Curated annotation (Swiss-Prot):
<comment type="function">
    <text>Hydroxylase involved in the biosynthesis pathway of the red naphthoquinone pigment shikonin. Catalyzes the key step C-3''-hydroxylation of the prenylated phenolic intermediate geranylhydroquinone to form 3''-hydroxygeranylhydroquinone.</text>
</comment>
<dbReference type="Pfam" id="PF00067">
    <property type="entry name" value="p450"/>
</dbReference>
<keyword id="KW-0349">Heme</keyword>
<dbReference type="GO" id="GO:0004497">
    <property type="term" value="F:monooxygenase activity"/>
</dbReference>
<dbReference type="InterPro" id="IPR017972">
    <property type="entry name" value="Cyt_P450_CS"/>
</dbReference>
<comment type="similarity">
    <text>Belongs to the cytochrome P450 family.</text>
</comment>
<feature type="transmembrane region" description="Helical">
    <location>
        <begin position="3"/>
        <end position="23"/>
    </location>
</feature>
<keyword id="KW-0472">Membrane</keyword>
<feature type="binding site" description="axial binding residue">
    <location>
        <position position="436"/>
    </location>
    <ligand>
        <name>heme</name>
    </ligand>
</feature>
<dbReference type="GO" id="GO:0020037">
    <property type="term" value="F:heme binding"/>
</dbReference>
<keyword id="KW-0479">Metal-binding</keyword>
<dbReference type="GO" id="GO:0005789">
    <property type="term" value="C:endoplasmic reticulum membrane"/>
</dbReference>
<protein>
    <recommendedName>
        <fullName>Geranylhydroquinone 3''-hydroxylase CYP76B74</fullName>
        <ecNumber>1.14.14.174</ecNumber>
    </recommendedName>
</protein>
<keyword id="KW-0560">Oxidoreductase</keyword>
<dbReference type="GO" id="GO:0016705">
    <property type="term" value="F:oxidoreductase activity, acting on paired donors, with incorporation or reduction of molecular oxygen"/>
</dbReference>
<keyword id="KW-0503">Monooxygenase</keyword>
<keyword id="KW-0256">Endoplasmic reticulum</keyword>
Amino acid sequence: MEYTTILVGFLIGFVLFKALTRKSKNLPPGPHVLPIIGNLHLVGSIPHKSILKLAEKYGPIMSLQFGQIPTIVVSSPSMAKEILQKQDVAFAGKRIPDALNAHNHWQFSVVWLPANSLWRTLRKILTSNIFTNNRLEASQHLRSQKVRDLVEYCKKSGDKGEAVEIGQAAYRTSLNLLSSTIFSKDLADYYSETGAPREFKDAIWNILVESVKPNLADFVPILSMFDLQGIKRRAGIHFGKGLKIMEGLVNERLEHRETHGATHNDILDIFLNYCDEHPDELDRHRVKHTILDLFIAGTDTTSSVTEWTMAELIQNPQVMKRAKDELAQVIGKGKCLEESDVARLPYLRCIMKEALRKHPPGPFLFPRRPEEDVEVAGYTIPKGAQVLVSIYALGRDPNSWEDPLAFKPERFLDSELDFRGNNFEMLPFGAGRRSCPGLPMAVRMVPLLLGSLINSFDWVLDGGMKPEDLSMEEKVGLTAQLAHPLKIVPIPVKEE
């Protein structure tokens, strides 16, 4: 980012428009606020780490100022419960990143919409028609096939002694799982990418990149009209490409339905059927945005969890061995898992929980926004403030977790703690009415994928690197990822 541009932008915002937020004498504690920039100078290149250090000083509910935006950071289970459960309705609003104004995308997004009639319609379709146990049971063969495709790709790489970039491989697997579930076709190829599949994959990735870039307009909203950094313009280009591909796939399906009827019974058919039955609630334009939303939210998350977990297993060989021993005993060496196997693999489930605790896909839940002043823990959260729940901090709270920086899956063996939104010590998928609707699919896909990779291969770092030399540095996108992609060589294990 051009720091000169940032400075000029803030000066323009400060000179032309005084801060719109009124001061509150009863804000939670926080650091001294500088003119114009507020506390932005305290947020480093890895914001969730910098903010965790500030929270250790100022407490579990903390006040920051990001440009013109008052920001409240919550970093303890009790405070998270207050925001997400006890006063969920008061904090149901969202603060919209300026990049999502491109093509008015947020106005059709189940993630970003306020709790209005369209949001309730989309949420109902997702939770009652798509991510139900019955439908997920019926589609488990798809997930198994996509995992087998990944294992086959890894075997071919291993036979040639080539390393696999595990995050990218998992990303393609997630992309194909979603596209098969939604459209009944694959949109990614492990071996070559050309034409529409490559264009769509790049569009999704670039939307993610632009959406999370530090944006002047998010700190000084009046600057949105100038788009000084060009973020909204570039986001618009990538949204346009993604929506154009969506439109082509929808039109292709409509032509098929005219001739053959609704024969696929996939997610696209569910949406189109709903459009036909409830045209006053949903139309095809909204469907395109909603499906694009599923790809944006669903692909990066699974790949991030997979990469972090494999990195931790490489660095903790005793955990890898225990996982392999359990898998060998329950299903036999070298075999891919089926979803029905996961219930008999408690240590594998603990590995997933521990990875989600230590490396949640998103370090913060999407920012909440109260529409009125709200009292929390004796403090006043002002109307229009940005409220951030730090999932990263919850998972590393020494009051909740013994030795929180260590990777110890066994901590969950005798624990009832889970990640489905009922235990506020770890909330990787959120809680309450705005929790992730795709959670039921994630809890099926991630252990299936991880277990198959662990059981089908032995893994060594590329180039003879030792596990203790593996970098665990982070970079920040929509999800927190390894700064240096994990490249590991698969050594196929013979089936027994």
